Design a protein with these regions (language model features):
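Polar, glycine-rich mid-to-C-terminal structural blocks
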Residues: 213-277
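An extended, acidic, His-containing surface patch that forms the Zn2+-binding/catalytic region
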Residues: 190, 248-325, 337-346, 354, ...
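N-terminal helical capping/dimerization or prosegment-like subdomains
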Residues: 1-95, 325
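A common structural junction motif
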Residues: 87-88, 240, 244, 349-358
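Acidic/histidine-rich catalytic neighborhood of metal-dependent amide-processing enzymes
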Residues: 117, 122-199, 461-462
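Acidic, glycine-rich active-site loops and adjacent beta-strand->loop/helix elements
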Residues: 87-89, 153-161, 184-189, 212-214, ...
Length: 462
C-alpha cells in the first residue's frame, strides 16, 4: 500500500495532464454561447468521480446548469464529509491582457512558483482546487485509505451566483446529510505558510442605470443645457465614499461588528510585506478606509466598488454626443452580521435619493449572499489544522478572506453543517483576472493534504 506522498509523486504527470485537459474546456457559465462547453465539463466531472471510486454518480438537472453529485458510503455509522466545488469559470475578458490564450493552458515558472504554474482560466478558481479532491479520493479508494463516507456536490453556476443551488439543497437535505462540508476555493498566505480561512465576506451586487434625454444628443447643440447621464452617474458614484473612504450609504455600518484589539493583533501576526504587495500590483501607494491596515481593509471591513461603467460612444475615433443612458455595476463586500438583502435595499434607497433633477435612476439587484465565520474550536477546524501540520510541517494560521462564497451560509442554514475552507491557492494567482494560474506544487500538495483531513476528522469525530 502506497503512502499518499508516494502515490502523488508516482502519478503527478497524469494528475497534471488531466487538469490541463479540464482547463481546455471554456465552461463560462455567464455566457450562453458556452452552454455546450459547460455541459461537457459536467460530463467530464461525472466520469472523473466514477473513476475516482464513487459508487454512485449522477448529473442533477436544474433550471440552469447541472450539479454533479457523487458518493461513496462505506458505513452509515461513520462520519460523512460533503465536498463542494464548482466547474464553471469566469469570463476571460479582457483577452488582450493575457500572455497566452486563456483556454490553452501553459506551464511557466514564476517567482512564487519556481516549480511552475498552470496558466489558464479556472486554474485556481476552481477547477484546479476542486480537482484536488477528486484525485485525493482516487488515492484513498485505490489504497483502501478512505476512513469515512464522502459525498461530492460540484456545481456549474458558482460564478453567476449559484442561482439554482439553493433550491437543489433545500430539496435534497436528506441526500446531502453530512457531518462537515469541505471546500477548497480559497487560498494560503504564502507557499510555505499554510492557512485556514475562518471568515468570508458577504456580497451584494447591483446594476445602476441613469437615464436622461430620450435619445443621444449632439453635444454642441445640447451640451450645458441638458443633464449628461455619464456626468451625473460619475458624480453620484464619487459621493458614495467620503474623504476618509468611509461608505456614505446611511445605515451601511449599523450592524458591522468591530474586532477587538486582541483579534486585530492576532491578524497582524500573519506575514505580510506592504512593499512586496505594492510591487506585485505595480502601484506606489495603497488605498482604503482610514484607520485600518491593508490586510484589515480587504478582509474584516465592508467595501463598495464599481466593477464596470459604460455609456455613450466608446468606439474608435470621436463622436460628440451626450448619451441618453449611463450604466454601472457595483459590488459591496459585507462582513458577518450585515444582511445582504438589507444592504441592497439601503443602497437602492440612497442611490435613488441622490439623483438630481433631469435624470431617472434605476437600481437592479443581482445576486448576493451572507458572510460566514468558522469557529476555530470546531472538530473540522482542528482536523484541517492537523492535516496541514502533517504535510507542511507547521501549524496553519487562521485568516479572514475578503472574498465571498455565498453558498457557505446557505449550507449552514439548510444542512446545519459547518464548512471548512482548505484553500491552496495564493492571492497572487490572479483569479478573475487575466493570466490566472495555479502552482503545480500547490496542486499536488493539496492532493497530498486532503486525505489527512479525512483521517483526522474521522478520528476526532468518534
Amino acid at each position: 500500500m502506497k503512502t499518499v506522498q508516494s502515490y502523488v509523486n508516482d502519478n503527478k504527470d497524469r494528475f497534471l495532464n488531466e487538469l490541463i485537459d479540464l482547463l481546455k474546456i471554456p465552461s463560462i457559465s455567464a455566457d450562453s454561447a458556452y452552454k455546450a462547453d459547460v455541459l461537457k465539463t459536467a460530463d467530464v466531472i461525472k466520469t472523473s468521480l466514477e473513476k475516482a471510486g464513487c459508487d454512485h454518480v449522477e448529473i442533477c438537472e436544474t433550471e440552469g446548469f447541472p450539479i454533479v453529485y457523487g458518493e461513496k458510503i462505506i458505513d452509515k455509522n461513520l462520519p460523512t464529509i460533503l465536498v463542494y466545488g464548482h466547474y464553471d469559470v469566469q469570463p476571460p475578458d479582457p483577452l488582450d491582457l493575457w500572455n497566452s490564450p486563456p483556454f490553452e493552458p501553459v506551464i511557466q515558472k514564476t517567482e512564487l512558483h519556481p516549480e511552475g504554474a498552470i496558466f489558464a482560466r479556472g486554474a485556481c478558481d476552481d477547477k484546479g482546487q476542486m480537482y484536488m479532491h477528486v484525485k485525493a479520493m482516487e488515492y484513498m479508494t485505490a489504497n483502501n485509505e478512505l476512513p469515512c463516507n464522502v459525498k461530492f456536490m460540484i456545481e456549474g453556476e458558482e460564478e453567476v451566483g449559484s442561482i439554482n443551488l439553493a433550491k437543489y439543497v433545500a430539496s435534497n437535505r436528506e441526500k446531502l446529510t453530512n457531518d462537515v462540508i469541505l471546500i477548497s476555493d480559497t487560498g494560503m498566505i504564502a507557499p510555505d505558510v499554510p492557512s485556514i480561512t475562518t471568515g468570508l465576506r458577504g456580497l451584494s451586487y447591483v446594476e445602476v442605470e441613469v437615464t436622461g434625454p430620450n435619445r443621444d444628443l449632439h453635444s454642441g447643440l445640447y451640451g450645458g443645457a441638458v443633464a449628461n447621464p455619464i456626468n451625473v452617474l460619475t458624480k453620484m458614484i464619487a459621493s458614495l465614499h467620503d474623504e476618509n473612504n468611509h461608505i456614505t450609504v446611511p445605515g451601511f455600518y449599523d450592524k458591522v461588528e468591530n474586532l477587538s484589539d486582541a483579534e486585530r493583533a492576532e491578524m497582524a501576526k500573519a506575514p505580510f510585506s506592504l512593499d512586496a504587495y505594492k510591487k506585485a500590483l505595480d502601484i506606489d501607494a495603497v488605498y482604503g478606509e482610514e484607520g485600518y491596515t491593508t490586510n484589515e481593509r480587504n478582509s474584516i471591513r465592508p467595501t463598495l466598488d464599481v466593477n464596470g461603467i459604460w455609456g455613450g460612444y466608446t468606439g474608435e475615433g470621436a463622436k460628440t454626443v451626450i448619451a441618453s443612458k449611463a450604466y454601472a455595476k457595483i459590488s459591496m463586500r459585507l462582513v458577518p452580521n450585515q444582511d445582504w438583502e438589507d444592504i441592497t435595499e439601503l443602497f437602492k434607497t440612497h442611490f435613488e435619493s441622490i439623483a438630481p433633477k433631469g435624470v431617472k435612476v434605476k437600481v437592479t439587484p443581482h445576486h448576493g449572499g451572507q458572510g460566514y465565520v468558522t469557529p476555530i474550536d470546531s472538530i473540522g477546524y482542528k482536523a484541517a489544522s492537523k492535516a496541514y501540520k502533517q504535510t507542511f510541517g507547521k501549524t496553519p494560521i487562521p485568516q479572514r478572506s475578503g472574498g465571498s462564497i455565498p453558498i457557505v451560509s446557505l449550507f449552514e442554514k439548510e444542512l446545519k453543517s459547518k464548512t471548512i475552507l482548505m484553500g491552496f491557492g495564493l492571492d497572487s494567482d490572479a483569479i478573475h483576472s487575466p493570466n490566472e494560474h495555479f502552482g503545480i506544487w500547490n496542486y499536488l500538495k493539496g492532493i497530498e493534504t486532503i486525505p489527512w483531513f479525512y483521517k483526522y476528522f474521522t478520528e476526532l469525530k468518534k
